[in-house]
C-alpha cells in the first residue's frame, strides 16, 4: 500500500494480504483493521501493509443529500444508494464512490481473518466463521463505499453457489477514527446524509488486485 503515490483527497477500501484484515482510506488517511495473536481487534494508521486488492478514487468535493427514509437492511440501503446515484448521472454500471454520515440503529460488521486451513479449502461459511464480528447500536459513524452493477468479483463479493454477486462494498469508521470494519448489514431510523462525488471531471476509479486468489 505504501506504493500509492497520489494520496491527497483519496478514498478507498480493500483487504490485507491473505485476508488478514481490512483497509479503509478516508481523505488520504489510512486505517488498517486487524487482529492480534489473541484475536483482539487492532486499528492502526499506516500505509505499511500488503493488500489483496484496493478500490480507490480521489474525491475533492462531495454533494450532500439529506435522506429522510428509514432503512431496514442492506438491500434497502443499496437500493437507495443506486436510486440517487442514477439521479446524479453517475456511472452505476462500472462503479462510483459514496460517503454516508449517520447515526446507525444497528450495524453488523467484521474484520476479515482467514486461518491457513480455511484458505486451503475456502468457502464463504468458513471465512465467516473466521472473521471477527463487530456490532454497533445507536452510534454515529461514517461509511465509505463503492458501488456498481458490475462490482461483483471486481471490488465486491463475487457470485458463489447459493448467493448472487454483490453490487456494493462498504466500510464504517467511528468519528474518532478508533474503529473500523467491513459492513455486512445495517439498520437506519434517523435522518441520514448520503454524499456523492461532484462531477468536475471523469472519475478515476482504480481497482488494484495484488493476488490472484481470495481477492474479495
Residue ranges and their predicted role:
Residues 30, 105, 148, 177, ...:
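Short, glycine-/Ser/Thr-/acidic-enriched flexible segments
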Residues 154-164:
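Exposed beta-sheet edge/beta-hairpin loop segments within beta-rich domains
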Residues 71-155:
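Long, positively charged binding patches that form subdomain-scale interaction surfaces
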Residues 33-34, 108-109, 180-182:
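Short helix/loop capping segments that flank catalytic or ligand/cofactor-binding pockets
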Residues 164-166, 171-216:
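C-terminal structured interaction module
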Residues 20, 95, 165-169:
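Extracellular structured ligand-interaction cores
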Residues 35-96:
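Contiguous hydrophobic, core-forming segments of folded domains
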Residues 1-56:
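N-terminal low-complexity or amphipathic/hydrophobic leaders
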Amino acid at each position: 500500500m505504501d506504493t500509492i503515490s497520489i494520496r491527497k483527497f483519496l478514498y478507498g477500501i480493500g483487504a490485507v494480504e491473505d485476508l488478514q484484515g481490512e483497509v479503509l482510506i478516508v481523505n488520504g488517511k489510512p486505517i488498517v483493521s486487524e487482529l492480534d495473536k489473541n484475536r483482539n481487534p487492532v486499528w492502526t494508521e499506516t500505509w505499511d501493509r500488503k493488500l489483496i486488492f484496493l478500490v480507490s478514487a480521489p474525491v475533492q468535493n462531495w454533494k450532500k443529500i439529506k435522506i429522510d427514509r428509514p432503512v431496514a437492511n442492506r438491500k434497502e440501503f443499496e437500493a437507495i444508494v443506486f436510486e440517487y446515484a442514477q439521479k446524479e448521472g453517475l456511472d452505476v454500471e462500472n462503479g462510483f464512490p459514496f460517503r454516508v454520515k449517520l447515526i446507525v440503529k444497528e450495524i453488523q460488521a467484521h474484520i476479515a481473518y482467514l486461518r491457513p486451513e480455511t484458505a486451503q479449502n475456502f468457502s464463504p461459511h468458513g471465512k465467516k466463521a473466521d472473521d471477527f464480528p463487530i456490532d454497533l447500536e445507536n452510534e454515529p459513524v461514517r461509511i465509505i463505499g463503492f458501488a456498481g452493477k458490475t462490482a461483483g468479483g471486481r471490488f465486491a463479493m463475487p457470485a458463489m453457489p447459493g448467493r448472487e454477486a454483490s453490487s456494493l462494498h462498504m466500510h464504517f469508521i467511528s468519528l474518532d477514527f478508533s474503529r473500523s470494519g467491513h459492513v455486512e448489514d445495517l439498520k437506519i431510523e434517523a435522518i441520514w446524509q448520503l454524499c456523492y462525488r461532484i462531477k468536475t471531471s471523469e472519475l478515476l476509479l482504480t481497482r488494484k488486485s495484488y493476488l490472484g486468489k481470495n481477492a474479495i
